[in-house]
């Protein structure tokens, strides 16, 4: 498979996930920069310059989304898994050794946070994920390093 096709597929999947998030109407009601107490484990918006950092960020989001009860999260989590697979193919094409990122070491507190504020967690996570994906889309055009 030509690597340009993999890169194009990666960008298309990112756009699809961003659209899925946009289709979940309540995600528009919060700024991704908004500080929400207790949700510091959700990655914020910061430049994601390398393929390994992209994979690491997606692993954390995937871990957060799979612990949420909403049906919408299952599809987005599956999309993130596929996106991570594509990033690994891109990394391999650049002779990068990309270890499979595992997300956060401790998300034990997530259960309590979800019980207390599941809706807020979902809104903030999706909003920040959308911003991170848009950043990744931009970075892919710059041919990110390992």
Curated annotation (Swiss-Prot):
Intracellular or extracellular location(s): Secreted
Transmembrane segments: none
InterPro entries recorded: 4_helix_cytokine-like_core, Leptin
Example GO biological process: energy reserve metabolic process
Superkingdom to which the source organism belongs: Eukaryota
GO CC terms, sorted: extracellular space
Bridged cysteine pairs (disulfide): 96-146
GO molecular function: hormone activity; peptide hormone receptor binding
Alphabetical UniProt keywords: Disulfide bond, Obesity, Secreted
SUPFAM superfamilies: 4-helical cytokines (SSF47266)
Role according to the record: Key player in the regulation of energy balance and body weight control. Once released into the circulation, has central and peripheral effects by binding LEPR, found in many tissues, which results in the activation of several major signaling pathways. In the hypothalamus, acts as an appetite-regulating factor that induces a decrease in food intake and an increase in energy consumption by inducing anorexinogenic factors and suppressing orexigenic neuropeptides, also regulates bone mass and secretion of hypothalamo-pituitary-adrenal hormones.
Entry's family note: Belongs to the leptin family.
Record PANTHER family: LEPTIN
The protein, known as: Leptin
Taxonomic lineage of the native organism: Eukaryota, Metazoa, Chordata, Craniata, Vertebrata
């Amino acid at each position: 498979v030509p690597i340009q096709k993999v890169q194009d597929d990666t960008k298309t999947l990112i756009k699809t996930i961003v659209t899925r998030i946009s289709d979940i109407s309540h995600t528009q009601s919060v700024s991704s920069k908004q500080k929400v107490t207790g949700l510091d484990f959700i990655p914020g918006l910061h430049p994601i310059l390398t393929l390994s950092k992209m994979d690491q960020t997606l692993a954390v989001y995937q871990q957060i989304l799979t612990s949420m009860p909403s049906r919408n999260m299952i599809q987005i989590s599956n999309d993130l898994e596929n996106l991570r697979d594509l990033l690994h193919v891109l990394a391999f094409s650049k002779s990068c050794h990309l270890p499979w990122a595992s997300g956060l070491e401790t998300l034990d507190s997530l259960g309590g946070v979800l019980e207390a504020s599941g809706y807020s967690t979902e809104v903030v996570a999706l909003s920040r994920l959308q911003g991170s994906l848009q950043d990744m889309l931009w970075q892919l055009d710059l041919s990110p390093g390992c």
